[in-house]
A protein has these predicted regions:
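Active-site-adjacent pocket scaffolds in enzyme catalytic domains
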Residues: 1-90
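C-terminal domain-boundary segment and adjacent tail
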Residues: 31, 41, 77-149
Length: 149
């Protein structure tokens, strides 16, 4: 992903593709959690000016820890509820829940309860969610594109 989610459509995707990157996870909201692309499944970006698909896969970012802790100012308990609703919405629609978690949330004084939030969310989700790598999501997406055209 691009740091601070700094992104320029479609230029960033072109640059990433030229650098050999297979996928990106920058397309999300910094100030609120949710589905910036309308859903959370893989997609192949499209350059409207050149009228062509770009050679990179976008895995839209659904939620980021800092968004809930800083921008939305949610206490840790409410963040768990919010993550769970977003995960459920992603699963229901067949998407992937891309979560960005920073190591700075280890600071219990600055972000009380947030490290526990991540652990709770991961362990609670383990019974229902399937945890996969971005590489696997890309492989499955490309396979579907080949078989469905």
């Amino acid at each position: 992903r691009q740091h601070y989610l700094r992104f320029s459509v479609p230029d960033t995707w072109y640059i990433q593709g030229q650098c050999g990157l297979r996928y990106d996870t920058s397309v999300g909201f910094a100030d609120r959690a949710g589905f910036r692309c309308g859903w959370s499944g893989c997609l192949r970006p499209f350059d409207v000016e050149k009228r062509m698909e770009l050679p990179i896969i976008e895995l839209p970012l659904v939620a980021m820890d800092i968004t809930l802790a800083v921008y939305e100012k949610l206490p840790a308990e409410k963040a768990i509820e919010r993550f769970a609703r977003l995960l459920d919405a992603s699963e229901t629609r067949g998407g992937a829940f891309v979560l960005l978690w920073h190591n700075t949330l280890h600071d219990h004084r600055a972000f009380p309860g947030y490290w526990d939030t991540m652990e709770y969310f991961l362990f609670a989700s383990a019974g229902t969610a399937e945890f996969v790598t971005a590489a696997r999501l890309c492989e499955e997406f490309e396979l579907r594109m080949v078989t469905t055209g």
